[in-house]
Amino acid sequence: MTDKVRLTTMVQAAGUAAKLGPAGLEEAIHDITRSDDPNLIVGVEGAEDAGIYRIGDNLALVETTDIITPLVDDPFTFGRIAAANALSDVYAMGGRPVTAMNLAFFPACSLPTKVLAAILAGGSDALKEAGACLVGGHTVEDNELKFGLAVTGLIDPARVVRNCTARPGDLIVITKPLGTGIVSTAIKAEMVEPVLEAEATRWMTILNAQAAELMVACRATAATDVTGFGFIGHACEMALGAKVTFRIELARVPVIPGVPALIDDGLVPAGCYRNRQHYEQHVSGKSGDPLLPLFDPQTSGGLLITFAPDDARTFLSRAGEEGLFAACIGEVEPAGGTPLVFV
């Protein structure tokens, strides 16, 4: 039975914690230059979540891909989380996913094919909910299991939400709590309570579709999704890109209940420490273990959004009415000192 397979024991690191760290990635892509195609709206020059390519006066493609290792043991659930994680980059830009292709790296010598079938079914389940069409895919026989999607979306070029356009005076909102990387590490070690595992899994399987639609309707000034570089890494990208400072109230940043206890037990992914090593120079006001959940690599994390104050209040009100989680956690200020200040 596929439900008895422990996928997390077959990989070195779980989910987005397996991604190349920010320092190594910056070095690897340093010499890649932007295309001079006039229809390219968003390319490789920044830290954006997806590329944007104009195909008409009021229409552009949103292009992204994302592949992760298992962070839960159930194959179907892993497939759904991996798909939700890949779709999220389109949502973060304000786009609507329309097509996707499976990307599967599978250890055929150590796992039965029915495990891959269950993973693909989980991915298809997320795509169906998103209203996107699966149009193909590619498989590679590999020693370590990985799955993800290449996703194409559509967007009006005038309504693209970038991650580098926050403005002083904006309020900062997040739409999911933090801590999934830490919980995934505990799952791999078989040191997590079932209730906590179920709660983290629930958050990771939720699509950012509804939050993104509301974000666009409420005129977000900037947005990203919180993934492998953790909350602090992605918030730094936003603040540095916009040349502003994010003032964050640490007590208001939502963390999945039970995560601090896992930190006390030493169940922290290596990616969390890599993120801290790279980004702590950009942080002031607070330090130490209270910030570890904010360095934690997230998989299928929430949207981190900035709004003008009135629009933020509208978003929070409507999110509550629609049953969406959302928390206002800080304010954008003119640049001064470090990009992130915690109070």
Curated annotation (Swiss-Prot):
Q: Where is this site: Important for catalytic activity?
A: 19
Cystine crosslinks: none
Q: How is the cofactor bound?
A: Binds 1 Mg(2+) ion per monomer.
Q: Tell me which InterPro entries the record gives.
A: PurM-like_C_dom, PurM-like_C_sf, PurM-like_N, PurM-like_N_sf, SelD_I, SPS/SelD
Which molecular-function annotations from GO does this UniProt entry contain?
ATP binding; magnesium ion binding; selenide, water dikinase activity
Entry's EC annotation? 2.7.9.3
Q: Where does ATP bind?
A: 19, 46-48, 66, 89, 137-139
The entry's Mg(2+)-binding residues are 49, 89, 225
The record's catalysed reaction(s) read: hydrogenselenide + ATP + H2O = selenophosphate + AMP + phosphate + 2 H(+)
Question: What positions constitute the catalytic site?
Answer: 16
Q: What class of enzyme is it?
A: transferase
Q: GO CC: one term?
A: cytoplasm
Cofactor(s) the protein requires to work: Mg(2+)
Q: Which family does it belong to?
A: Belongs to the selenophosphate synthase 1 family. Class I subfamily.
User: What binding partners and quaternary form does the record give?
Assistant: Homodimer.
What is its biological role? Synthesizes selenophosphate from selenide and ATP.
Q: What is this protein called?
A: Selenide, water dikinase
* Organism field: Geobacter sp. (strain M21)
- What gene is behind this protein? selD
